[in-house]
C-alpha cells in the first residue's frame, strides 16, 4: 500500500485516519484471502526521517491498522542523511513497531544528465556530492555502501532494497535522436512517450550495457 504514501504533521490536508485504516485493513484482508503468506507493506517516502514515520504509524497503531512490513524510500538526492543514518533509521523504526522494514525505492545517478543533456529526476546529492560523483564507479560505490549498511541492521530486520528504476534505459527514437521512446507513460494528447527522467540512474548505460 503506497508508492508512496506521504504524511507528516506539516501536510495541510483533511485527516480521516479512520477512513484510511478501513481502507488499509480492507486491502490487507483481501491480500490474505488470496495469498495468506504474502506480506502487506505500507510504504512512505523520506526513509531516514523518523519523525514522519512515527507520526504516521502511531496514528495507524491507535486504530488497529493491519500490515506486516514498513516500507521506506531512500534517495540521497532528496535526503540530508547518508546510508549509515538510513541504517539507524531502520533500527529505530523496526524496534519501535516490532516490524520488519524494507527500502522500497533507492537510486543514484551514474551520469550527470540524461542522454539529451537535461537533468534527470535525481539531481546531485548534497550528502554524497564530495564522496561519490555521478559516474558508474560512484554509482557502484554508493550502492555497495548502502547494501553493507543495511545488512547490518539489528536482527536482520531489513528485508532488502528495491532499486528504482533498474532497466528503464534510453530507447532512441529514430525520428529524433535526442528523444527516448521509453518513459513514465504515453501522453493521451499526442500518443507520445513522456520524458524518461531515470535513464541516467538505471543499472545499465544508455546503450543497455
Task: List where the protein language model places each region.
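Short, well-ordered beta-to-alpha junction loops that form the rim of enzyme active sites
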Residues: 1, 44-46, 106, 163-166
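Active-site cleft segment of glycoside hydrolase catalytic domains centered on the general acid/base Glu
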Residues: 1-65, 80-88, 176-184, 190
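Glycine-centered small-residue hotspots that permit tight backbone geometry or close packing
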Residues: 1-2, 71, 160
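Aromatic-rich peripheral "rim/lid" segments of glycoside hydrolase catalytic domains that contact
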Residues: 9-12, 88, 92-95, 111-145, ...
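The substrate-binding groove and active-site-proximal loops of carbohydrate-active enzymes
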Residues: 13-19, 46, 73-80, 128-138
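A structural signal for short coil/turn segments at secondary-structure junctions
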Residues: 35, 64, 97, 154-156
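Aromatic- and acid-rich polysaccharide-binding/catalytic face
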Residues: 42-44, 53-84, 88-92, 96-122
